[in-house]
Amino acid sequence: MQLSVWTYEGPPHIGAMRIATAMRDVHYVLHAPQGDTYADLLFTMIERRDRRPPVTYTTFQARDLGGDTADLLQSAARAAYERFQPQAMLVGASCTAELIQDDPGGLAQALRLPIPVIPLELPAYQRKENWGASETFYRIVRALAASSADGSPRHERKAGARPVCNLLGPTALGFRHRDDLAEVTRQVVELGIEINVVAPWNATPADLARLPQADFNIVLYPEIALTAAQWLNRQFGQPYTKTIPIGVGATRDFIREVAGLAGVDAEPVLSRAESRLPWYSRSVDSTYLTGKRVFIFGDATHAVAAARVATQELGFEVVGLGTYAREFAREIREAAALYGIEPLITDDYLQVEARVSELRPELVLGTQMERHIAKRLGIPCAVISSPTHVQDFPARYSPQMGFEGANVLFDTWVHPLMMGLEEHLLGMFREDHEFADHAPSHLGAAPAAPPQQPQLRVVETVTSTELAWASDAERELTKIPFFVRGKARRNTERFARERNVNLITLETLYDAKAHFGR
């Protein structure tokens, strides 16, 4: 066990809650102590949902452990059915209740309720949130889809009938899942494909029973839906997509893949496709972004997609790539090999911070924790993956997928760099007479009183390696853009050490610049 102030994923029962909360007419009975009810706040406070998750907690206390906690669970399950009248019930235990070993699923099934009761066995001390969501969705699909079909391969589509697909993966508390779903739905409809079921988002148990009626499945988030899609493929012969439409290039590949599975022509849709990212990334005001060093960390789906967009569409250089999801370590390693870098597979945020400090990138793309890390290190950052905070569940339309999602990516990733450059330019020209506080105002007001000039610092700064910076060299260093200032300082100090120069003057700084600029 590791004590930490931050975790990238919660226990697996949080993943189960994400599935139950995303669906309709489903109720989750969770065998848990009173302290585990904190999870409701993830949905009401962070995601800002207008209703509580459909979860009933047994909320046993310490004094109950000497009695029959199994009876508590059965009473809670019976009361939940009578009050909420769900079409299906999920039953499981939290990480704390798992230690009691009460077998919640078996106890609930013994009640003989007139609805499907789906037991969830989620090992809290071996697995985490995304796996819990994937396993829960798989168990629900297997229980409900299998009960409505004889297991035979799907029937071939009649001539002239529109192709039909399912959209799998969007959940509650997912990073931009609501808007991604709207964007992908629009693209699928433009291809002339009918959508049979979207799951788990807003799906009912009756909807999941109709999953076998589709011709193929679109997997939007492999962390959630891949296991279920693989089972549907084996059981009903439904193929599934493997391309994630994040970025212009990936979206075009996705449209071609979907069109191939549906047997339709993708070119009319591709010819009408519009995204401002390709032109913006080539435009004059963006050329200074070329070659910027970027560090990427998040869930595997978003991290791998972000690396492709960064290198192929924005001209960045990926210097770090990693994930906290060990189940998808293979995908991250394969992607890292393409960029010739060492992957970082860890759920320890301290290791991530150490890697960022070591690489000193010019942009960090990550989760909420990487936002904190980058802020401490003074590096621009954009959030690309869960876990996130409340500001990453915006009221506005802000997808990550599709052509509109590519526009959002450009704004989200590039604006931190552009605003940083703007601040640098203001600082660089602050001493010019045009920007002086006592200059005449165009508003006709009296000029401001001349400000007190601070005394120039003449004391030389000494680093831990006994290198001294002259005050004029230090001032000149501040005129270098912030996103390369650290590199300029390191190169200059390295240049000075190699030549046994103890005092870095303005001339030393210029000599170092000329040396490394060759």
Curated annotation (Swiss-Prot):
Co-factor binding comment: Binds 1 [4Fe-4S] cluster per heterodimer. The cluster is bound at the heterodimer interface by residues from both subunits.
Pfam families referenced in this protein's UniProt entry, alphabetically: Oxidored_nitro (PF00148), PCP_red (PF08369)
E.C. number(s) listed in UniProt: 1.3.7.7
Keywords: 4Fe-4S, ATP-binding, Bacteriochlorophyll biosynthesis, Chlorophyll biosynthesis, Iron, Iron-sulfur, Metal-binding, Nucleotide-binding, Oxidoreductase, Photosynthesis
Catalyzed reactions: chlorophyllide a + oxidized 2[4Fe-4S]-[ferredoxin] + 2 ADP + 2 phosphate = protochlorophyllide a + reduced 2[4Fe-4S]-[ferredoxin] + 2 ATP + 2 H2O
Any one GO BP annotation for this protein: photosynthesis, dark reaction
Obligatory cofactor(s): [4Fe-4S] cluster
Positions that bind [4Fe-4S] cluster: D36
Primary enzyme class: oxidoreductase
A single GO molecular function term of this UniProt record: metal ion binding
Source organism superkingdom: Bacteria
Active site residues of this protein: D285 (proton donor)
Pathway it works in: Porphyrin-containing compound metabolism; bacteriochlorophyll biosynthesis (light-independent)
Job of this protein: Component of the dark-operative protochlorophyllide reductase (DPOR) that uses Mg-ATP and reduced ferredoxin to reduce ring D of protochlorophyllide (Pchlide) to form chlorophyllide a (Chlide). This reaction is light-independent. The NB-protein (BchN-BchB) is the catalytic component of the complex.
Subunit structure of this chain's protein: Protochlorophyllide reductase is composed of three subunits; BchL, BchN and BchB. Forms a heterotetramer of two BchB and two BchN subunits.
HAMAP family linked to this entry: ChlB_BchB
Family to which this protein belongs: Belongs to the ChlB/BchB/BchZ family.
Descriptive protein name: Light-independent protochlorophyllide reductase subunit B
Gene that encodes the chain: bchB
